[in-house]
Amino acid sequence: MVLHSKVAIVGAGAVGASTAYALMFKNICTEIIIVDVNPDIVQAQVLDLADAASISHTPIRAGSAEEAGQADIVVITAGAKQREGEPRTKLIERNFRVLQSIIGGMQPIRPDAVILVVANPVDILTHIAKTLSGLPPNQVIGSGTYLDTTRLRVHLGDVFDVNPQSVHAFVLGEHGDSQMIAWEAASIGGQPLTSFPEFAKLDKTAISKAISGKAMEIIRLKGATFYGIGACAADLVHTIMLNRKSVHPVSVYVEKYGATFSMPAKLGWRGVEQIYEVPLTEEEEALLVKSVEALKSVEYSSTKVPEKKVHATSFSKSSC
């Protein structure tokens, strides 16, 4: 039974539209609304997607930030893009203002809503969204390393000649340069990956770089990535809506570390229902801690940016 049915996608760019498109064909939403500061791009995306909606039978329309606040699930894809030569701290500060405007415009947010942050840097923005929204930590999640994990499983599936869905392996930590692969816990058919003869031949450093660098290669060739992350975001919405209780690596607040980063989490209609500890080697644990500590320093400073009272109308004046 579908416990959630109305989804709001905040951000009508390529990622937001790709998410809407992928979600439409799952036929699980009673309604999808798209929200953006640019009315022309919203209208264009809705008109285009409406043609596909006639086949999927999922209603889609433009909506307001206030309406988004009353949706069952809110997917935030809007965010400021990094300017050439801009320090990361400045980008985060600008994205803080964007999120502040978005979430301020959504108030009052329904208390049982689930927010899924897709915009980058996703771990930091998820942490900020948790702080600004006032929702319980389990109801604010980020797409995190879900796409990275998918890429890893596809790669290992090719190496070991199995369906990627039969590969159980996770990319953990930051969705970014410091992310790490939990090799010790990886398995195929219940057999540890480390026990396969092929494992010793793997260039794990090269694989890690290829997984984390794939997005930049796509951006270099065509300017942006959106289909893969759109499909992943739609799948996460699907998991939450149907209360599937599936385990995915998503960006969540982990109390043990006091930070927001990707760990395997069971997802249901309440959002995160359980976070799983992954067995790691000492070396892997050190890499994860290093990744988390780097995020913590930024997450802490980002949530210390002085907050301003934001009204619903201010969202329409922000640049996303």
Curated annotation (Swiss-Prot):
Substrate binds at R88, N120, R151. It is found in: Cytoplasm. GO terms for cellular component: cytoplasm. InterPro entries: L-lactate/malate_DH (IPR001557), L-lactate_DH (IPR011304), L-lactate_DH_AS (IPR018177), Lactate/malate_DH_C (IPR022383), Lactate/malate_DH_N (IPR001236), Lactate_DH/Glyco_Ohase_4_C (IPR015955), NAD(P)-bd_dom_sf (IPR036291). One of its GO terms (biological process) is lactate metabolic process. Its main location: cytoplasm. Its EC number is 1.1.1.27. Keywords: Cytoplasm, NAD, Oxidoreductase. It comes from the Eukaryota. GO terms for molecular function: L-lactate dehydrogenase activity. Pathway: Fermentation; pyruvate fermentation to lactate; (S)-lactate from pyruvate: step 1/1. NAD(+) binds at N120. Converts pyruvate to lactate. Belongs to the LDH/MDH superfamily. LDH family. NCBIfam families: L-LDH-NAD (TIGR01771). This is L-lactate dehydrogenase A.
